[in-house]
UniProtKB/Swiss-Prot annotation:
Pfam families (UniProt xref): CxxCxxCC
Record NCBIfam families: PRK05170.1-5, PRK05170.2-5
InterPro entries membership: Puta_zinc/iron-chelating_dom (IPR005358), UCP006173 (IPR008228)
Family: Belongs to the UPF0260 family.
HAMAP family: UPF0260 (MF_00676)
Protein name per the record: UPF0260 protein CJA_2436
């Protein structure tokens, strides 16, 4: 029997169907965190302040279909935009696949379990606060290193 390569190893992001591309999202919620960028160095710092539409337990957007209309700065990833979205976490499957790297064992496509990202402690579940509970001028006080 010949082993068949999984789609994320056999295709580029551009070759994937929309459903395949969407399934790469592990549901970590890290892209929904407020980030700060050092203007001098370009370094990106994640905070534990999440978008008001992020479900803090499931780490999914509660308004996914309307997210861009509701949050102007919400980035909608496409196969062509991944490479330029430099702030994606190093564990992000979109980034890994674009770089030709394997997915982590805890990724739901590998584990077969949609909760494995949470079980492995790789999601923001239980680690974030909602943006409407903090003063956004104080985001520097919320910088975290666990991303």
């Amino acid at each position: 029997m010949v082993a068949q390569r999984v789609f994320w190893a056999a295709k580029t992001l551009q070759e994937m169907s929309p459903d395949e591309f969407e399934s790469l999202c592990d549901g970590c919620g890290k892209c929904c965190l407020h980030k700060l960028e050092d203007e001098d160095t370009g370094d990106v710092y994640y905070t534990n302040v999440a978008c008001r539409h992020l479900d803090h337990d499931r780490c999914r957007c509660t308004r996914y279909d309307q997210r861009q209309q509701l949050v102007a700065e919400c980035v909608v990833l496409t196969p062509d935009s991944v490479r330029d979205t430099y702030w994606l976490p190093e564990t992000c499957a979109y980034r890994l696949v674009d770089q030709g790297l394997p997915l982590f064992d805890w990724h739901p496509l590998i584990s077969g379990d949609p909760d494995s990202v949470h079980t492995a402690g790789m999601s923001v579940a239980g680690k974030v606060v909602a943006e409407n509970t903090v003063a956004l001028d104080d985001l520097e006080d919320y910088i975290v290193r666990w991303v």
